[in-house]
Amino acid sequence: MASQPPEEPAEFQVSDELECKICYNRYNLKQRKPKVLECCHRVCAKCLYKIIDFGDSPQGVIVCPFCRFETCLPDDEVSSLPDDNNILVNLTCGSKGKKCLPENPTELLLTPKRLASLVSPSHTSSNCLVITIMEVQRESSPSLSSTPVVEFYRPASFDSVTTVSHNWTVWNCTSLLFQTSIRVLVWLLGLLYFSSLPLGIYLLVSKKVTLGVVFVSLVPSSLVILMVYGFCQCVCHEFLDCMALPS
């Protein structure tokens, strides 16, 4: 197994977050306040003033040195940009000792003791307290989370759907059986029709005159009927066409 790289200490990560990524100086509560641009990058106020003095950005706009995103200045003042509240809290706690630093630099657990340590007579010049409010999610009990819960839902119309499906299956089977029977009957009639002439001759030879005449005359009579039907159909079409012509 490949060994994982050693993780950096939490104190080093916190100190790295408290440094400006341009001048690498530590943020403070005076000239180097952490300012947040619209692209969510943090730059100290002193570096922002230098960027404005260099004239690289248009009037009333600051171009982010990291992603070149333009941030509008509300009053053409760097002080109008929002501060990074989490870093301000860390800076305030850092002046009180390491025990005030939270485990997660983006979270601040509020307790009466911690609030008392933040607000002291030595901070009479401060007129605001920055607080990050987070919603704590309640963890479910281990007994419930370890056991999978499976719910079965049976709709009220389940029985009716089953009945309709069964009836549809029966109807399909009946329809298929009927179609098969019709096909078999048509094949039998066709076989009887085409074999009627030799069968009639055989019956005449066997001295069964009546049946022999019927079977022998079946094919010619059917052909005559078809010819008469076709002739009548042609006459009817011609008559209808003549009636449809304008007089």
Swiss-Prot record:
Gene3D superfamilies: Zinc/RING finger domain, C3HC4 (zinc finger). It is a multi-pass membrane protein. InterPro entries: RNF182, RNF182_RING-HC, Znf_RING, Znf_RING/FYVE/PHD, Znf_RING_CS. It comes from the Eukaryota. The RING-type zinc finger domain is required for E3 ligase activity. E3 ubiquitin-protein ligase that mediates the ubiquitination of ATP6V0C and targets it to degradation via the ubiquitin-proteasome pathway. Also plays a role in the inhibition of TLR-triggered innate immune response by mediating 'Lys'-48-linked ubiquitination and subsequent degradation of NF-kappa-B component RELA. This is E3 ubiquitin-protein ligase RNF182. It comes from Rattus norvegicus (Rat).
